[in-house]
Amino acid sequence: MPARIWNPPGHWRLLAFLLLVVLVAIAFQGFATHTIGPSSEPAGSATAPLANARPILAARGSKLVSVQPPAGRRIALTFDDGPYPVVTPLLLQTLRDLRVPATFFLIGRDAEQYPDLTRAIAAGGHEIADHTLTHPDLDRLSDAAVAGELRDGAASLERIAPDPAERRLFRPPHGRFTVATLRAAQSAGFDTILWSDDPGDWRDVTADALRDHVLAHAVAPEIVLLHSGRQATVAALPEVVDRFRRAGYTFVTVGALLRRSSAEQLNRPAKVALGG
């Protein structure tokens, strides 16, 4: 008897097609909102940033950033959240001892709670940037709510520590954003900043593990995602700074990095092998 080939009725073929359409739509939504991949809540109060985030810069007008050619390797250390009354002063002292400027993406409500610490960050020559007012997942908010978080967060920081440079940098909490998020930031005059390396200090990692990760994943130019409430991060900084300097890097703020790097360099950083 010849083999029988099952030919599904028309309604089954239609259902299969519709299922495929739904699956494709779900996948597209995940990529569009940057929510596909590991983004679960780790132990503690921190939330995991997106695993494969890269510096994404929302345009002002028709440009992302200036296109001046870079001179040498540059690295920007960025610290999210806070400020915090115990660890942030230790972090500021360490950065002062190392003569390293950094960019702090502060939460507006936390800055209001600790205004003296916020002013100390600015007085130390560091760049203060917007990390929203209350640290929500922006990809779950309406366009109006996103704009409000950016506007109110920036206003809180400006009241406490006015920025003479008037540069407006913004990082979405947990790295979660949609196209609408970027448009809202652009409309408000913000450059949206992610990172080239996330060593995972939002988890309970040791200083040695953090150091090893940063050194193994070096690129140029470099934007490193760190957090201002982690003692392991503070402990890892002296050796990290020393190794990068020996490899020819200059430590700058994100604002300085944007002024000296092209959009192509920022979104496609070159891998660098650091010497021992």
Q: Which stretches of residues belong to each language-model region?
A:
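Short low-complexity, flexible loop/linker segments enriched in glycine and/or proline
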Residues: T118-I121, A144-V146, A207-L210, Q265-A270
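N-terminal pre-catalytic segment of deacetylase/amide-hydrolase enzymes
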Residues: M1-L77, Y84-L98, E239-R243, A247-G276
